[in-house]
């Protein structure tokens, strides 16, 4: 960051934590107090979702390394119909490892939370196994992120069919961009699909990139101004589905389905 205090997003590489003995020390020295680690259930399932054998074991090693360096681990777990029973075992594992007690010893609290994640980008592929709200294990309800705001897809559709507003992807005062190694640029709140691409720094130039950002002139932002949530729910919603969504995640799911179709037309 330039001329301001750096922002910390509590994200770090667990791959590097277990391979670089200086990495945790570096994190501590720059003021990191909590690092989030992501599970997808038990060992085999977590390895498969992450795409690397041994990933689950590395997450547990990273947990130990963080604690040894005065940094609290925070566990999150993504839940779906396939892994719900495995995810239900994670609080027991945290208790077995005495993570709450050990975090208190370093002046922090241990946090574990569960959610289904958004349903855009790669997560769209998991829609068929998205968790049914009534199938969420009761033991996980206290850990479920914003459970009180969770709805079924049917409830989301019913609500949005009455909504004449457009999806709002206008820029706020603070804009964060993702820039790839080939200089393509996206907003950080989207996934990196062609529909959301702002442009290319080398091909389009900084002035044109800034114009597109300031004028909100990207394919996705233009399309958002042309359609209402009621239209999205009518075209793409499943009024019989009991899949669990927050209303915000469901709005994003519908709009991205629409974007994908419009972009391919």
Q: Which residues does each predicted region cover?
A:
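Short, flexible coil/linker elements and helix-boundary hinge sites characteristic
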Residues: 21-22, 98, 236-237
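Alpha-helix boundary recognition
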Residues: 28, 67, 95, 211-214
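Alpha-helix C-terminal capping segments
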Residues: 1-4, 134-136, 248
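Flexible mid-to-C-terminal extensions adjoining Fe-S/redox cofactors in radical SAM and related proteins
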Residues: 184-265
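Radical SAM enzyme [4Fe-4S]-AdoMet core and its adjacent flexible, acidic
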Residues: 33-34, 40, 48-181, 186, ...
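Conserved SAM/AdoMet-binding glycine-rich loop
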Residues: 1-38
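A generic secondary-structure micro-motif detector
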Residues: 12-13, 52, 80, 209
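Short, charged, surface-exposed secondary-structure boundary motifs
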Residues: 21, 45-47
């Amino acid at each position: 960051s330039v001329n301001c205090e750096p922002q910390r997003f509590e994200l770090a590489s667990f791959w590097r934590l277990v391979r670089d003995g200086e990495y945790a020390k570096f994190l501590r020295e720059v003021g990191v107090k909590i690092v989030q680690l992501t599970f997808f259930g038990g060992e085999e399932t977590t390895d498969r979702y992450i795409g690397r054998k041994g990933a689950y074991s590395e997450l547990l090693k990273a947990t130990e390394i963080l604690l040894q360096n005065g940094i609290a681990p925070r566990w999150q777990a993504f839940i779906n119909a396939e892994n719900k029973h495995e995810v239900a075992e994670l609080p027991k594992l945290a208790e077995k490892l005495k993570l709450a007690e050990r975090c208190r010893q370093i002046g922090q609290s241990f946090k574990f939370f569960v959610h289904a994640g958004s349903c855009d980008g790669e997560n769209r592929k998991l829609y068929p196994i998205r968790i049914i709200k009534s199938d969420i294990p009761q033991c996980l309800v206290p850990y479920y992120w914003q459970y009180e705001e969770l709805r079924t897809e049917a409830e989301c559709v019913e609500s949005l069919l009455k909504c004449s507003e457009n999806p709002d992807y206008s820029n706020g005062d603070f804009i964060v961009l993702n820039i790839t190694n080939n200089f393509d640029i996206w907003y950080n709140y989207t996934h990196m699909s062609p529909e959301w691409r702002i442009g290319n720094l080398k091909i389009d130039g900084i002035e044109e990139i800034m114009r597109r950002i300031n004028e909100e002139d990207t394919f996705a932002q233009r399309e958002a101004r042309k359609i209402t949530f009621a239209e999205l729910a009518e075209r793409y919603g499943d009024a019989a589905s009991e899949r669990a969504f927050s209303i915000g995640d469901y709005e994003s799911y519908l709009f991205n389905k629409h974007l994908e179709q419009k972009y391919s037309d």
